[in-house]
Amino acid sequence: MSETTPAPGFKPKKSVALSGTAAGNTALCTVGRSGNDLHYRGYDILDLANTSEFEEIAHLLVHGKLPNKAELAGYKAKLKSLRGIPAAVKAALEELPPSAHPMDVMRTGVSVLGCVSPEKDDHNHPGARDIADKLMASLGSMLLYWYHWSHNGRAIDVETDDD
């Protein structure tokens, strides 16, 4: 496929067709409150990125508030306990080639996880939070397991005490 270059002086037009149109209402995220900013549950993302750990922001998004020290310690312990991935997920990941894109690997892992650990019929808030926590905890495990298997032929233990 040949690359095309724009004519000299060509400037792409900024689409304004949906400017000012709400794409959806959510308590999780606000975009463009005062320009090109991003807020998670009212907190500026730049402030969070500079002062918070991953698990603190995850807790904010999933549970609605920043955790105190005790809550953060408990949340980290919970996520550690959820790192494991079922044998069926490992088997599916072992079939993926080393050339697979990491996003495709995670999508496949989540699809298999959803089949072997189906959601309950009632989607109450605590149940939905548990699902979000399980996904957050296991996505890294899926990616690491696949990478070590596909690139080194080695199955690794993903249930560790490592931070």
Residue map of PLM features:
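Hydrophobic alpha-helical bundle cores within soluble ligand-binding/oligomerization subdomains
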Residues: 2-163
